[in-house]
Amino acid sequence: MAIYITNTETGKKEELKTIEPGVVKMYVCGPTVYNYIHIGNARPAVVFDAFRRFLEYRGYKVIMVQNFTDIDDKIINEANEWGVDFKDVADTFIAEYWKDAQSLGIRAANFHPRTTDYVNEIVDAVEKLISKGYAYTVENGDVYFSVKKFERYGKLSGKKIEDLISGARVEVNTLKKDPLDFALWKAVKPGEPSWDSPWGCGRPGWHIECSVMSQKLLGDTFDIHAGGEDLIFPHHEDEKSQSEALTGKPFARYWMHNGMIITRGDKMSKSIGNVFLVREAVKRYGKDAVKLFLLSKHYRTPIEFSDEIMMENKKAALKVLKTLNRFEEKYPYPKVPKRDEYMNDIEQKFVEALEDDFNTPKAIALIFDLSKELNKAMDEGKDDEALKRYHLITRVFGSILGLFEGGVKISEGENTNKVIEEILKVRQEFRKAKNFEAADKIRDALLNSNVKILDTPDGTKWEILEVEE
């Protein structure tokens, strides 16, 4: 069967036909590294990591590029606030990104280029755009792309130039020939890092970096460009326009965009101040709950984030993990089951769901069904049937989506009991010191980990809560 994806440029679901048979070349916009990543940042990373896994399962060789924007106004501002070099900020948060990515089981792309490693190539690209008449310099050393010179501007986002001119989003800049024009090169300002160029010292604009890095690593035209829908305009529109002006060729054949994370009615964003960091989410809800949350809705739809919703995902993830744990305790060295019509049929349904515009909600529903069947098979002593379902959940479906593949144990072993008892000793010390706020925080943290405590006249009692089936 063919794979179909929704192409943002056409607004239609299209069959994936790659430039080179059996190979998918894919670029995913990565983070600007000035802070820790939040759940909103994690959605494209998780979604397109899973999509890449699925493509590999279907036999494609995937060449994936995800960039790091390591020079930007936000990075410079952060460096000035800390009193350090901008490279220290970028290096710090690239390292922190990898910690968060690892905590979610996100695999590295084939290439992770950094903007500052491609400045010479960016300067060359800007020079070519100037020579072709698509860009111009201004008196302070800035270089701008002339939007009206590129007739197809607005094709990706569906925006018309006349509407943009009157729109509130257009920045007023008297140096530009037209208010819609965007920066390819920014002239140096006092205290900012800079690089030499024919127009004087400065640094790359945001959009040109992705054009240059993607085309250098994947070619002038590649298969898929992906990212969050908030990047469609202006970032991806500008990127597409300057790339096609530069080469005279189509840029990306397909554009995939994930929906936003919504919290308290707004897009999750550092600028709004409504973010929830990935590391906080993994600590509070667990890796599989976070990934379940990000994959249980179709990738193109927005997702509402709240503690209540996350706790529901945590409960759902724990149901599956508890079932898998039960199987692994009974069969510590599970073998590979013999393929039969049932396994082939279920796997085909799973694959068909993902072939249809990467319908992860439908695919995940099959995992939950298998988990229930696995429990039933163990209850009835049907070992072979249990093994088939365990194999599909962990080694096939879980491997494709990056779910339930970590072998998490949630049993009440001797070590678990000792840890809880030690935590309760610390809590008791806080209670003796009348630091009830700290004691309550420990109580709440234990409850979030499904450990219920009760203070009685005979001391503190505790129990591990059963996860409802």
Curated annotation (Swiss-Prot):
It comes from the Bacteria. Its cofactor is Zn(2+). HAMAP family: Cys_tRNA_synth (MF_00041). It catalyses: tRNA(Cys) + L-cysteine + ATP = L-cysteinyl-tRNA(Cys) + AMP + diphosphate. Signal peptide: none annotated. Its EC number is 6.1.1.16. Belongs to the class-I aminoacyl-tRNA synthetase family. Binds 1 zinc ion per subunit. GO terms for molecular function: ATP binding; cysteine-tRNA ligase activity; zinc ion binding. One of its GO terms (biological process) is cysteinyl-tRNA aminoacylation. It holds the Pfam family DALR_2. Keywords: Aminoacyl-tRNA synthetase, ATP-binding, Cytoplasm, Ligase, Metal-binding, Nucleotide-binding, Protein biosynthesis, Zinc. This is Cysteine--tRNA ligase. One of its GO terms (cellular component) is cytosol. ATP binds at residue 270. Monomer. A motif ('HIGH' region) lies at residues 31-41. Zn(2+) binds at residues 29, 210, 235, 239. It comes from Thermosipho africanus (strain TCF52B). NCBIfam families: cysS. A motif ('KMSKS' region) lies at residues 267-271. Gene3D superfamilies: Cysteine-tRNA ligase, C-terminal anti-codon recognition domain (1.20.120.1910), HUPs (3.40.50.620). It is found in: Cytoplasm. It is an enzyme of class 6 (ligase). SUPFAM superfamilies: Anticodon-binding domain of a subclass of class I aminoacyl-tRNA synthetases, Nucleotidylyl transferase.
